Amino acid sequence: EGTLHEAHLQEYQQQGKHRRLVTVFQGVVMGYQFARPFSSTTLVRQDMGLLNGLINFGSRLTGLKLEPVKMVHPDFERRFEVVSTDQVEARYLLHPAFCERLMEMEAAFNGQNMRLAFAQGRVVVVIETKDMFESGGIEADGDDARFATTIDQLGSLIDLTQALNERAR
């Protein structure tokens, strides 16, 4: 059981007497019950190099003791930062085949900001994108390419959904 939403979050920002609407997030948000039982909290985000330490410090302020996890998949380790309350369970959730699917999904979305949260038996996947289901406008030029990209992206979402429903072997 899961949900898939295309979301556009905006907020007003004040600069002197001027108030303007700014996009905070635009993209896809998916939430699913994970097929494998788990009790830890695990977060996955694109690797930010030296900034990872600052972000990890900020995560300690939430009361969770999230520690960096070394992953067995070398390409995944290079591209993503994983933090968790349980190192062993994080590797159990993010097994190599699942990591492959995540990297395929990242490629389908052109490496745009993708994040995952595993908590309370569920996984939430957030990917920043432009409007997935909107055409380019009145002019049809480029619509075929946009349609093909959308099909690839939806295919990667379906593949990930299937991976989420796979039980441990």
Features from the language model and the residues they span:
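Charged, low-complexity intrinsically disordered regions
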Residues: 1-169
